[in-house]
Structures are given as C-alpha cells and as structure tokens.
Amino acid sequence: VNVDVTHRLLVRIAAVAACVLPIVASSAGPAAAAPALGPGGAPAIVVPAGVTAAVAVYDRSTGTFTEQRDTALQVRAASVVKLLIALDYLWNLGPDYTVPAADRTRFDAMLRGSDDAAASAFWSRGGGAAIVTRMVGRLGLVNTAPPPAGYPGYWGYVALSAADTVTIYRYILDSAPARVRTLIMDNLRAATRCASDRYEQYFGIPEAFTKPWAIKQGWSGFGTPPPTVCGAVAAAGAADASASAAAIDLTSGALHSTGTVGAGDRAIVVVFTLHPAGTSLVTARNALTAVTRSLRVPGAAAAAPSLWVGTWGSGVRVRTGPDTATAPVGTVPTGGDVRVDCQRRGAEVVAGGYRNDWWAHLPEFGGYMTNIYVRTPGNTIPGVPEC
C-alpha cells in the first residue's frame, strides 16, 4: 500500500486509539433513528445535542412557512452578511445597475467564493456599520444590528436572524430590480465548492439537496481546520477573530447555510447553527447538514446521504476501485477531512498491525480510500451506507 505512513505514527495511533477513537467517532453525527414528531404530528426538526439552531423555510409558491424554529434569535451572521453588503453597494447604481469592471471582479468573488478581502473593501467603502443601518431601514429588518461596540471593522459580527434572512431573500427575489436580482442570484447559483480562503463550503443545503439551489454560506470560530479537497485553509481574518462577551454570541463556532432550493427558487431555506467552543469543523458540518436534511422543503429533492470524517496518516491514496491494484486518482490531504457517501468491502489492506477490507467512497475524488486511515472506532464508518 503506497501510504507513506511512518512506523512511529502507527505505534502512536495504536497506543492512543482507545481514548481517541470514541471521541472522533462522534464527528460522524447522530445515528439514523425514527423521526420525532413535532406539533401537529409533523416530523420535528433534528437538532443534535449541544447545537443551537435557528431555522426558517419559506415556500414562495404558497407564501407560507413550512419550518420555523427560533426565527427571531440573533446570531452573528459571519459571511451571510455579504448579502446586505452586496445590496447596499448596488442600491445607488440604478437605473441600469452597471457594475464597474474592477468592482465586478470583487463583487462576484464576494458572493461566489465568499471572499473576505472583497467584503472588507465594500464594507469600508460603504461606511461599515452604516451599511447595516441603511439596509435595516430599507428592508424593514427587525432583528438585524451592526457589530457590537468595540468591533466596528468586524462585518462578520453583524447580528442577523433567520426571519430577517428570509426577508432579505424575499426582497432580492420578489422586489429588487431585475438587474439586481440577476447579479446576486446568478452568483449564488454559481457558488464554488472551494471558498477563497479554501474552506469547503458545500455543507448544509448543497449536501442535503440536489440542484437547483443557490447558496450563501457562513462560518466563524473554527480556527484553522484540517485540510480538505480544497487544500489547507487560510488563517482567520476579520470575520473570525477572538472576542469577549457581547450582546450576541461571538465565541461559539458559527456555521450557517442559507439560500434557495428548487425550480424557480421555490423555497427559501435558512439554517443558522452555533456549536460549543472547541467543536471540530467536521462535527459542526455533519450537525448542520443533519438539521438541513430534516427540514420540509417544498420542491426539493434529497441528495444521497454523506458524512464528513477525519483521517490520519500521510500520502494516503484514493483509487478507482476498492483495491490497491487499481489506479490512484488522488491523495488525501495529510490529516485532512473528507466526505464519504458510501462504503464497501474490497481487497484487504494490512498496515501496522491493522487489517481492514472496507473502503470508503470519496465523491470529491471519485474514488476509494481504505478505511484503515479513517478515524472510526471499527472497520466501518457509523452512519454511512454500503455502496
């Protein structure tokens, strides 16, 4: 097996497996269970223990909400606030809303790749917190506020609620000038898997539902997580810094998925989640996607289930089939996180005293890696179906 894992690392992993593996196993998320029922007999929203979730799903066809949970709760918006930054920038460009070429590059990067430098440029040009004040008045937002005192430059610390986020999307889709709607929604539909800071941003809505969808994601408070197929994540910036107590929670990990799902942008979906400080990004991703999958979203088609898992070792090959004799198609980032959509038996691999004939399928690579190098308590990954 061409995995280039040192003997020292294997011995260390074996020695601490008893205490490490039960901990990392929890990152796979809750095991499947019969759905609980909420008021009126409808399936309840799934919220893993320890997670704070604010949720809203709005059906544009009927003008009604199909899901609501803590919709007035103020959370730090992280990159979801880029919707307000974009709207404020476009507000005075009418009547044709032509964006200068240099600004268009920044504008597209801010929405497609969640580029922080672009957002900071527009934030500064627009007067910082004044952007939020203007947009609150223009859209009639009721639970949105500028960053707390002492953090004027931290646009990611803007307070936003699920209800107000639905209002923002409803304005873009139903009331904004057609050119404004096109400029924003075309970018959200073209959101890239890898953000500008190399976060993998296809969590929540993109993991839970098949296209068509359009997304604006947000993340803050996870430091520098393990690498993914997108590479090593850049250091935290202005949207993600340490903070003391404030009117909103600035210390918990924040992971949000917002956007539209279905033909004609039928459903507006907003899922804000907060996670205890120290929660790994892989655990938070699985929790957020579990919440999103449990929602009643009109016009949506469920995507195949998948989970994020941690790995160990270096030089771990991904192959075309579950066998070391098949051709390699890539290499897992050293100690990185990977998404697994199914697992199957294949050729047995023996390494460092471990034996395992189970292989995990990694959809982003289009191939299989041996489960030996997946952080899981046994030969198989809990919660992942067989291929």
Where are these regions (language model features)?
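Penicillin-recognizing serine hydrolase domain
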Residues: 36-54, 58-62, 127-304
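Flexible glycine/proline-enriched surface loops and loop-helix/loop-strand junctions
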Residues: 67-72, 113-118, 147-153
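SH3/SH3-like beta-barrel superfamily modules
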Residues: 330-378
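Secretory targeting and sorting signals
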Residues: 1-34
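Conserved catalytic neighborhood of penicillin-recognizing serine enzymes
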Residues: 94-145, 161-162
